[in-house]
Amino acid sequence: FADCNYFPYVAVAVRSIVETASSENAYDVLVFTDADVRTSIRERLLDVTRGCSNVSLRLVVLEKTDLAPISGLFVGGLSAMTYGRLLLPSLLANYRRAIYLDVDIVVREDLAHLFGVDLKGNLLGAVKDEGVIRFPFPPQWREDILRECPDFDFGPYVNAGVLLMNLEGIRREKSMVRALELAVRNRFILCDQDALNIAFVHRLFLLPVQWNQCTKALPIEPSTGSPDVLGVHRGIVHFTEVKPWRDLRRNTLAWMWWDVASRTSYYRDFLLMAERTNRLVRAKVCDLLKLWIVTRADNRLARHKCPSFLFAAHLSKWRNKLVEKGLLAE
């Protein structure tokens, strides 16, 4: 689910699917969007799968009637399309099983391996969200969930960025209808993710951590004890914290995303965007440092009654340091 502004990131995600796809399988990739797309934008995105006969990429434009069940829901600063996954059982009425993927991911292993996982009779397969469980969240988060489900166990709370869905079973048991009802009458901090965890509380299958390696949980070894967490093998990397296209330095796995991005027609756009972001960050850091320098110098003047020429020399010294670090132009 994405609007036109997210198509460049969709392209990277789809490209990673193409590059890990097996020639023995056929892959049907659907991108749902909430507005009609100009031909030029559509063609640029579809170019990602050009020459790959076993990967089909289709854009599905949703009408207002399709989105009516999620219109007006609390989004907490996110796009309303975040609730789109709750509509999948009805939108994919002719499908028995599907994989849902967030946009901010890179696929590192053939998705056919995930698609074939036995859910053991459950309706939804997902990976435990170590980042949410281990990191401090406001008490309101737990209170909201427990109000709807008093015996809720937060131990197996899952991340909704990668979902293996038993669509046939979900439609039969109306589990997604329940999730929608929960989302409508609550303002959950984590929106539809909280609603999904409650609605599927007894019908969840925990997938191996490799299928949704959230970057927020990287410093933490999941309770599964899987060696894949900081190792080489990662089925899907999910950039849940700092997005790689925004800050490469603060993301240890950003290179994986940029490696795939370099083989899309959006690569130059990403580079220009990163350069603009870098300039803004450097300008902000420079302003903060200059403010700190002036404040520090003012304090010294007040304490030691320094002559003005010493004050000027002090600023000059720090200015030179800023230039050396590339934070200030000469």
Feature annotation, model-predicted:
Residues 16-25:
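Short, acidic, metal-binding catalytic loop of nucleotide-sugar glycosyltransferases
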Residues 27-35, 126-128:
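Short internal beta-strands
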Residues 15, 42-46, 108-120, 176:
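Short alpha-helix within the catalytic core of nucleotide-sugar-dependent glycosyltransferases
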Residues 2, 6, 160, 165-330:
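A glycosyltransferase accessory/donor-loop signature
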Residues 42, 46-91:
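Active-site-proximal specificity loops/subdomain of glycosyltransferases
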Residues 116-179:
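Conserved catalytic core of nucleotide-sugar-dependent glycosyltransferases
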Residues 59-61, 65, 81-137, 164-165:
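GT-A fold catalytic core of metal-dependent nucleotide-sugar glycosyltransferases
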Residues 35-42, 134-135:
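Short, charged/polar "capping" segments at the starts of alpha-helices
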